[in-house]
């Protein structure tokens, strides 16, 4: 994000905070000092915005926007938490677990060594999936 008129003293600094696509819309809404609509065309409900504004990251590099980040696309599943990432591809029923701090290229599956962490991430992903129109798809 570059906003010289408002954040000039941070110009050129790089942030490594984790964010995802819905955070872009939330950031635009925050920057415009407006709110996300709840309805459109005479009262049709809009699904609430999922993201969080990234503007706080500009002034505080310790800001965590989300405890977990989730995703799913054509049965490819992902969940991030702290330095951990769990993934399952569309051809597999098995989740893999990676420590991104030690293994940025996701080469070493740690699911057997860390079953509690994997279970926590998969449980959180399933909660998210059940509330975000991922299921039912044969679960």
What are these regions (language model features)?
Residues 7-13, 17, 21-100, 117, ...:
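C-terminal cap/loop subdomain of S1 sulfatases and analogous C-terminal strand-loop tails that border
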Residues 6-7, 106:
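Short, well-ordered alpha-helical scaffold segment located
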Residues 103:
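Intrinsically disordered, low-complexity polar regions and short flexible loop motifs
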Residues 1-2:
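Short glycine- and hydrophobic/aromatic-rich loop-to-beta-strand nucleating segment
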Residues 108-116:
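Active-site-proximal N-terminal segment of extracellular/periplasmic enzymes that hydrolyze or transfer
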Residues 123:
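Basic, alpha-helical interaction scaffolds
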């Amino acid at each position: 994000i570059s906003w010289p008129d408002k954040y000039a003293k941070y110009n050129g600094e790089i942030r490594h905070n984790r964010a995802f696509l819905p955070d872009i819309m939330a950031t635009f809404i925050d920057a415009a000092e407006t709110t996300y609509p709840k309805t459109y065309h005479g009262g049709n409900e809009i699904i609430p915005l999922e993201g969080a504004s990234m503007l706080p990251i500009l002034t505080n590099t310790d800001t965590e926007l989300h405890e977990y980040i989730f995703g799913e696309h054509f049965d490819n599943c992902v969940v991030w938490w702290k330095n951990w990432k769990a993934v399952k591809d569309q051809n597999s029923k098995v989740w893999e677990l990676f420590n991104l701090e030690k293994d940025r290229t996701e080469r070493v599956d740690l699911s057997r060594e860390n079953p509690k962490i994997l279970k926590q991430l998969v449980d959180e992903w399933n909660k998210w999936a059940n509330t975000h129109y991922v299921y039912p798809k044969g679960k």
